[in-house]
Amino acid sequence: MNLILFGPPAAGKGTQAKRLVEQRRMVQLSTGDMLRAAIASGSELGQRVSGIMERGELVSDAIVIELIEQRLPEAEAAGGAIFDGFPRTLAQAEALDAMLAGRGRRIDLVVRLKVDDAALMQRIAGRFAESGRADDNPESFKVRLDAYNRQTAPLLPYYEGQGKLVEVDGMGSIDQVAAAIDAALTGAAA
């Protein structure tokens, strides 16, 4: 099964993806984690994307598509992938569909975590205080949320038109959200 966790920054995508990795033995393909690892390694790629991410801007389609393509064989071996933070643009969604189709696979389900902006701001403040992640400062977060609303949220009709979109209330506890995602996955597998 290939699943996209969709939602604004701080909606809980990473939290839910980690739980699914443990319970369903899927591979989490988080472009944010991959990009942060590149920055931490000091690689040429990391140096190129560091400033972009600190400003809260989106990294180019070409870079994130390349990162995902490198990790797809690992996901296939595990029996499925959880795409977290990808795709973020229509070009990325179309590239992902083409990559998977070339391997005889497809996106099975897109779960949109719905969380209101006030709760997102509260979550990001807590996460920034805990992690100190450069892209979690309030200014960068506002840029990221705006980028999500302008560039990523418009993907919803793309997946809705394919009959793959399920909306989950992301305002509940971690366990409540997990139960709703599990119900959606069970329905998609039936």
From Swiss-Prot:
Report which reactions are catalysed by this protein: AMP + ATP = 2 ADP
Task: Supply the EC number(s).
Answer: 2.7.4.3
CDD domains recorded for this chain? Answer: ADK
HAMAP family assigned to the protein according to its UniProt record, in alphabetical order = Adenylate_kinase_Adk (MF_00235)
Q: Give, as in the UniProt entry, the pathway in which the protein acts.
A: Purine metabolism; AMP biosynthesis via salvage pathway; AMP from ADP: step 1/1
Keywords from the named record: ATP-binding, Cytoplasm, Kinase, Nucleotide biosynthesis, Nucleotide-binding, Transferase
**Which residues are ATP-binding?**
10-15, 127, 172
**Annotated region (NMP), positions in chain:** 30-59
Q: Which SUPFAM superfamilies match?
A: P-loop containing nucleoside triphosphate hydrolases
Q: Tell me if Transferase is a UniProt keyword of this record.
A: yes
Q: Which residues form a coiled coil?
A: none
Span list, region LID: 126-136
Question: Corresponding gene?
Answer: adk
UniProt remark on domains: Consists of three domains, a large central CORE domain and two small peripheral domains, NMPbind and LID, which undergo movements during catalysis. The LID domain closes over the site of phosphoryl transfer upon ATP binding. Assembling and dissambling the active center during each catalytic cycle provides an effective means to prevent ATP hydrolysis.
Q: Which family does it belong to?
A: Belongs to the adenylate kinase family.
Q: Which residues bind AMP?
A: 31, 36, 57-59, 85-88, 92, 133, 144
Q: This protein is called what?
A: Adenylate kinase
Q: Which BP terms from GO are recorded?
A: AMP salvage
Gene3D superfamilies hit by this protein: P-loop containing nucleotide triphosphate hydrolases
- Function in brief: Catalyzes the reversible transfer of the terminal phosphate group between ATP and AMP. Plays an important role in cellular energy homeostasis and in adenine nucleotide metabolism.
Give the transmembrane region(s).
none
